[in-house]
């Protein structure tokens, strides 16, 4: 009897592992509806943390904010010391706030702020949580808790975790604070780190490296690789529209005087966003090659 049960239980584990593999393949292929269907079936018999987390991620990719929030909240309650769950809960709540009315957004401010703060407290090296707090304090009006001073503080914390992230963060805050010369100085400092960049864990950093490479015409080949990585790994959580990445990649190819590839990517940018003025200007520059 024990042998029969063992084989039966092993079969369940295999099915679960196979389903997880299929889900990962669908997610990598950006076939989120197929991933969702598999996970909804799997969660009926296997409501594990892994399945819930993956389903919450898929809901967020599909912009099903309420469904994602429900699952992330369950995970936060079940694992209150998991920094990533707090961050994701705050991040998805922020996306819901951005997609609705200002009145609804005001009611979510506390949840967003507290989730990011909790994540940063639980993990002193949590890069995404600090970026979330920087965005939060720069986006929210002062009367509702916005604070440039606090944004600078978290940018400084990022600098102690990762110098290149810190310089990008400080540049971002300076731009929002109208300190463009100081922002430029921070962007220039990021260039010192680019030649030694190996694996990039945070996809938004791929975009920033590609952007600064194009803006200052430095390390263009690396910039192209990183921007392609950003596009390949892109999800809605990355924040920057794909049209912007296509435009940046076209600009990088123009700097290499590669008209063929520049045209491919600038056309993708304009097809993705027809009124993209910067991309239209870039296409005119490409035509002069």
PLM region spans:
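"A position-specific structural signal for the A-helix of alpha-solenoid helical repeats
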Residues: 21, 54, 88, 95, ...
């Amino acid at each position: 009897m024990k042998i029969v049960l063992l084989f039966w239980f092993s079969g369940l584990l295999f099915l679960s592992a196979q389903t997880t593999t299929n889900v990962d393949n669908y997610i990598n292929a950006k076939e989120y509806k197929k991933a969702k269907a598999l996970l909804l079936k799997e969660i009926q018999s296997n409501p594990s943390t892994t399945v819930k987390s993956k389903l919450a991620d898929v809901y967020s990719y599909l912009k099903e904010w309420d469904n994602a929030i429900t699952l992330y909240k369950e995970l936060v309650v079940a694992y209150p010391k998991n920094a990533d769950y707090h961050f994701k809960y705050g991040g998805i709540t922020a996306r819901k706030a951005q997609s609705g009315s200002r009145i609804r957004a005001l009611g979510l401010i506390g949840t967003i702020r507290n989730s990011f703060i909790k994540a940063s407290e639980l993990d002193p090296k949590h890069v995404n949580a600090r970026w979330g707090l920087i965005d939060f304090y720069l986006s929210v009006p002062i009367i509702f808790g916005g604070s440039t001073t606090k944004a600078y503080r978290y940018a400084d914390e990022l600098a102690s975790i990762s110098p290149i992230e810190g310089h990008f963060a400080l540049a971002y805050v300076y731009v929002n604070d109208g300190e463009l010369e100081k922002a430029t100085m921070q962007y220039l400092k990021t260039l010192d780190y680019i030649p030694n960049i190996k694996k990039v864990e945070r996809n938004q950093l791929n975009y920033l490296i590609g952007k600064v490479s194009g803006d200052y015409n430095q390390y263009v080949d690396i910039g192209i690789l990183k921007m392609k990585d950003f596009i390949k790994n892109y999800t809605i959580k990355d924040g920057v529209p794909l049209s912007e990445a296509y435009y940046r990649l076209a600009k990088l190819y123009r700097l290499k005087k590669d008209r063929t590839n520049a045209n491919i990517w600038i056309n993708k940018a304009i097809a993705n966003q027809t009124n993209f003025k910067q991309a239209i200007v870039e296409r005119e520059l490409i035509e002069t090659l």
